[in-house]
């Protein structure tokens, strides 16, 4: 029989809905299901319910030891080759607690990060381009759960590529080839666009290009295998990759950046007159995350929000909220006729909006609570 996993509450949590469970700091709980970002647990009174996964931590030493072992096997520490992720039938100790229903421990597959990703929620995992993560769980909504550098969390699956059985050396070689491709032909190639930097950017590796806000650059290549990054040339001749959401295309698009075009104008977005929630002042339809960020930063106040169509899932939506320091984005899934955000379910989007005007949509570990105060105007 599988060993029961014990978790301990790191913070107090008060249930917001019937299917959730109140917990107290340092309370011991039994873990029943950890396949989502909210975990199902049982308390000493035999009551069960969902709690935020970042409010509890595992205290099961055998389970921790197994996780370390699985990670070592996957990374090949102390071995010439990595051990296959399929459990060895000759290892009954592993079989004794691998539960087929716990997807967290079923995968342990390496994947390589294609693009940088900054976590927006406390249960997400930040990604650094060029590093390797261990994929622990895959969900049908396009988000995967994995571990990197001792941290565990969710990230968008299209930011990584699976390398399965490829040895680490192959990946290093591919990075070398990628770098060589950037270095070669520095001063060749047609100018596709002239862009101006919206924000300063500091490179994290030799492939990328440093620039300051307002810098004008030529776009000379759009790598097909790296769609979020453009290859640009600065006026001093330096060439490298830049994140495309940090720049805007100049309107007149001169042939070279030696000209001095007028500063770019950001599009003014407004509530949508088409789409599922057309006519609602908070619905902005098909705008990008970047456009939402720009609008909230330019004319929003803390607590202002908008709802937009999801870029990654055609039938889903995102709530973008102006917050102190860093704006927040929350995914809303439409399952049949129900709108789901985390473990909470609402029959209409209007009901969801009204709920989070009264109840916090986000609570930090420090106790900071964020609400939907009013729609962006």
Swiss-Prot record:
Residues 282-376 form the SH2 domain. Changing residue 229 to K: Small decrease in RASA1-binding. Almost complete loss of RASA1-binding. Changing residue 143 to K: No effect on RASA1-binding. Almost complete loss of RASA1-binding. Residues 2-61, 106-165, 190-252 form the SH3 domain. The keyword Metal-binding does not apply. Disulfide bonds: none annotated. One of its GO terms (biological process) is negative regulation of transcription by RNA polymerase II. Keywords: Acetylation, Cytoplasm, Endoplasmic reticulum, Nucleus, Phosphoprotein, Repeat, SH2 domain, SH3 domain, Translation regulation. GO terms for molecular function: cadherin binding; cytoskeletal anchor activity; ephrin receptor binding; eukaryotic initiation factor eIF2 binding; molecular condensate scaffold activity; protein domain specific binding; protein kinase inhibitor activity; protein sequestering activity. The modification Phosphotyrosine is found at residue 105. The modification N-acetylalanine is found at residue 2. Pfam families: SH2, SH3_1. Only the first and third SH3 domains seem to be involved in RASA1-binding; the second SH3 domain and the SH2 domains do not seem to be involved. Interacts (via SH2 domain and SH3 domain 2) with EGFR. Interacts with PAK1 and SOS1. Interacts (via SH3 domains) with PKN2. Associates with BLNK, PLCG1, VAV1 and NCK1 in a B-cell antigen receptor-dependent fashion. Interacts with SOCS7. This interaction is required for nuclear import. Part of a complex containing PPP1R15B, PP1 and NCK1. Interacts with RALGPS1. Interacts with CAV2 (tyrosine phosphorylated form). Interacts with ADAM15. Interacts with FASLG. Directly interacts with RASA1. Interacts with isoform 4 of MINK1. Interacts with FLT1 (tyrosine phosphorylated). This is SH2/SH3 adapter protein NCK1. It comes from Homo sapiens (Human). The lineage of its organism: Eukaryota, Metazoa, Chordata, Craniata, Vertebrata.
């Amino acid at each position: 029989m599988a060993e029961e996993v014990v978790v301990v509450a790191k913070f107090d949590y008060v249930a917001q809905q019937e299917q959730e469970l109140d917990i107290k700091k340092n309370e011991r709980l039994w873990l029943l299901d950890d396949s989502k970002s909210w975990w199902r647990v049982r308390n000493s009174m035999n009551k069960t319910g969902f709690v935020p996964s970042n409010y509890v931590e595992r205290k099961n030493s055998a389970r921790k030891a197994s996780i370390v072992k699985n990670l070592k096997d996957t990374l090949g520490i102390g071995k010439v080759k990595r051990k296959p992720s399929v459990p060895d039938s000759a290892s009954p100790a592993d079989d004794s607690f691998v539960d087929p229903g716990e997807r967290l421990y079923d995968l342990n597959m390496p994947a390589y990060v294609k693009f940088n990703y900054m976590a927006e929620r406390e249960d997400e995992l930040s990604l650094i381009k060029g590093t390797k993560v261990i994929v622990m769980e895959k969900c049908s909504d396009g988000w995967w759960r994995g571990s990197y550098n001792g941290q565990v969390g969710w990230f968008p699956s299209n930011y990584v590529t699976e390398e399965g059985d490829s040895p680490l050396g192959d990946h290093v070689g591919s990075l070398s080839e990628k770098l060589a491709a950037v270095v070669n032909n520095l001063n060749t190639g047609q100018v596709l666009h002239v862009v101006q930097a919206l924000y300063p950017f500091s490179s994290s590796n030799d492939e990328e290009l440093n620039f300051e806000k307002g810098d004008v650059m030529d776009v000379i290549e759009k790598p097909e295998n790296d769609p979020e990054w453009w290859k640009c040339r600065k006026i001093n001749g330096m060439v490298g990759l830049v994140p495309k959401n940090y720049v805007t295309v100049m309107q007149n698009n001169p042939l070279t950046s030696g000209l001095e075009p007028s500063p770019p104008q950001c599009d003014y977005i407004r509530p949508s007159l088409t789409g599922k929630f057309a006519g609602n002042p908070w619905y902005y339809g098909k705008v990008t995350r970047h456009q939402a960020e720009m609008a909230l930063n330019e004319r929003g106040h803390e607590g202002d929000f908008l709802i937009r169509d999801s870029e990654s899932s055609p039938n889903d939506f995102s709530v973008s909220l102006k917050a102190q320091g860093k704006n927040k984005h929350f995914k809303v899934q439409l399952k049949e006729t129900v709108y789901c955000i985390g473990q909470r379910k609402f029959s209409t989007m209007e009901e969801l909006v009204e709920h989070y005007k009264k109840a916090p949509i986000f609570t930090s570990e420090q106790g900071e609570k964020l609400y939907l105060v009013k729609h962006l105007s």
